[in-house]
């Protein structure tokens, strides 16, 4: 570890942490800086944490036309594409399904996957980007701003405290969004993360092993309790 806290001080810290927010004011004074790239739909949830945080972002308003749009600019790993769907003739999801259909330039009906729609959105965004770069007319800028999907990834530099991280970890550890799980895994890797999570280092290791699946590890205390229960 890059930092070291003596066992007596660490024991005092954990007791104060367990005593509640009023007794662990020191956690508000431990600051963390990080660069995070995440989709706008995740930042919308993160922005509910207003107290004890500061963020500086790459401005979408000013930088939206700075580069060409590609799929790599979006969090789209869960979008269905051709590889994740059955062959066309076996697909039942497109039967008479107008939301998945569109007419191509030849007047033919086509059915699209969600990822294909995102690719089309990229093409449209790039079309208006080129027009905006050529003309500087704001109406083309508006097309990009209002068409931009919430899966667009934005980078921010954030500053927050161990106390804020403790609140995040408690309320978001089992959240539906994968991005929160990734952040909580990162939190567990911070120096003396037991201040944040409330778990001992041994418990954190056991949780990580159990999260792999097909295995369940118990602590020595749990093993003793189980053994006593058999008697």
Which residues does each predicted region cover?
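Family-specific signature for flavin-dependent thymidylate synthase
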Residues: 1-231
